[in-house]
A protein has these predicted regions:
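Short extracytoplasmic
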Residues: 55-91
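Low-complexity, intrinsically disordered extramembrane tails and loops of integral membrane proteins
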Residues: 1-11, 210, 235, 239-254, ...
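Cytosolic-side membrane-insertion boundary helix
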Residues: 12-14, 314-352, 376
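Alpha-helical transmembrane signal-anchor/signal-peptide segments
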Residues: 40-63
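Hydrophobic alpha-helical transmembrane signal-anchor segments
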Residues: 13-42, 345
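Soluble non-transmembrane domains of integral membrane proteins
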Residues: 79-81, 85-300, 304
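Juxtamembrane amphipathic/hinge helix adjacent to a transmembrane helix
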Residues: 2-6, 317-328, 384-390
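Alpha-helical transmembrane segments forming the membrane-embedded cores
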Residues: 7, 346, 353-451
Length: 451
């Protein structure tokens, strides 16, 4: 079932909010400029660090520690290894020959989906219609149902277990030690095959594959039922033992066997895989087995550490058997990708900042909704153009400090682009003016001859 709410905001209220947004827009642009400048410096420093590493690394064997390469940037690869036995402290799940043991926890809960639509009214006010719908699904964290707009969609208030990673502390690659924080992410995750008799699981849990499944509410009932069952069974056994003792004391009595304790069955309290219910908890286990890995880092005895260069630190531990050239290429690609992502983010921030600065104009025009829509479209285009020019300019200026020649070239390109755009606009305007029909001249008034 859906719940719908309708709210209205007056024109003066919208205008006041838009004026306040101007200050937020200025701050957003300022932050974006700083981020763009920092990103260019970071990118150049990382490029120089990788370039330095390319020209100053040495090859070394993985299976021995060479004193000749102590303190140098070295490249080696091979199979990782560990003797650590990783154990989940809550469920007793254990794995060998693994770099990490990962536990994921999800709960089946209600989710509130919000959909908004806003309509502009004559006079500048707006009417917002918000629709809330509800659906069930798996979530890794608790969803607070007390804030839902419709009652009857109650979620549990506790999640007994949380996601947790157990990592191997003693990992080696040949004769070299690999830090646990580097080793734990190597390789690909694999499902852990759980053995029911070796797992400490809730009473009503279903254990299948790498998953433990049970219902939070049903588990409480299962535990209560188990306690009652065990208490009743213990009482019956005690009565049987007493009767057997008395019978043994009578010479003519026959021997009465002592009853065995029956096993408690929690089938009726189990969750359903096919039809999950609110409160179902799904716990899955995965591991990262030992695998081939490649290192380019500084050798410090048996350990590897980040190698300091004039422009930064270089430290790479990657999955697979890779040449040094492949490691450097991967590092360069990652640096380029991050650089462009941050450039794009900076551009969007500046675009949004200019949009906020010009927002009062569109709100003023919203007195007539059609004019407001036209103004909003124009503001979006202008804000985008200004954002492109400003972000490009910031990047160019940043390069002036890092690589002056490249910075100058970028500024020249930016100036040429701006000049080209202005020239094109001028030509379009001139062409429109020339194509416009020239109004016909009015005939001169006839002169009356003098008498």
């Amino acid at each position: 079932m859906a719940v719908t709410e309708t709210t209205s905001e007056g024109w003066f209220s919208r205008l006041g909010g838009a004026i306040k947004g101007v200050f937020a827009g200025i701050i957003l642009i300022f932050v974006a400029i700083i981020m763009l400048g920092w990103n260019e410096k970071r990118s150049v420093d990382r490029y120089n660090t990788i370039d330095y590493a390319k020209n100053n690394f040495v090859e070394t064997a993985a299976d021995k520690i060479d004193s000749a390469t102590e303190g140098k940037l070295v490249h080696f690869n091979g199979m990782t290894a560990t003797n650590d036995v990783l154990t989940d402290k809550d469920f007793g799940v254990t794995v060998n020959n693994s770099l990490s043991l990962n536990r994921d926890v999800e709960m089946y809960q209600w989710k509130e989906i919000e959909h908004k639509s806003t309509k502009k009214n004559a006079g500048g006010s707006t009417t917002t219609t918000t629709t809330y719908t509800y659906e069930k699904g798996w979530a890794s964290g608790l969803i607070n149902s007390s804030s839902f707009h419709e009652s009857g969609h109650d979620n549990p208030t506790v999640l007994p277990y949380k996601a947790e990673d157990t990592v191997a502390e003693n990992v080696t690659l040949g004769a070299h030690k690999i830090p646990s924080n580097s080793a734990s992410h190597l390789g690909s995750a694999e499902a852990v095959a759980l053995e029911a008799d070796k797992v400490t699981a809730p009473v009503s849990a279903i254990i299948k594959g790498n998953t433990i499944l049970y219902n939070l509410y049903k588990e409480e009932k299962a535990q209560q039922a188990k306690k009652a069952f065990e208490a009743n069974t213990n009482a019956n056994v005690a009565t049987t033992e007493t009767t057997a003792t008395e019978a043994t004391a009578t010479p003519e009595a026959t021997t009465t066997p002592v009853a065995n304790k029956a096993a408690f069955s929690a089938i009726e309290f189990q969750a359903s895989e096919a039809a999950p219910q609110i409160g179902d908890i799904r716990i899955t286990f995965k591991k990262h087995p030992v695998c081939n890995a490649t290192v380019v880092a500084e050798q410090k005895g048996e350990e590897i550490v980040a190698h300091k260069t004039p422009s930064g630190e270089f430290y790479e531990v990657r999955t697979g058997l890779m040449t040094a050239a492949e490691v450097f290429k991967a590092a360069e690609d990652e640096n380029a990708m991050l650089t462009w992502i941050l450039r794009g983010l900076g551009f969007l921030m500046i675009w949004g900042g200019f949009g906020a600065i010009f927002k009062p104009i569109s709100v003023l025009a919203d007195v007539i909704p059609l004019f407001g829509d036209i103004a909003e479209s124009g503001i979006s285009i202008i804000s985008g153009l200004l954002a492109a020019v400003l972000s490009f300019g910031v990047i160019a200026i940043a390069w002036l400090f890092c690589r002056p020649l490249i910075g100058i070239l970028l500024l020249i390109l930016m100036g040429a682009a701006i000049f080209g755009i202005i020239t094109l606009i001028s030509k379009v305007r001139a062409a429109k003016k020339a194509a416009a029909p020239v109004p016909a001249a009015e005939p001169a008034p006839e002169q009356t001859p003098a008498a």
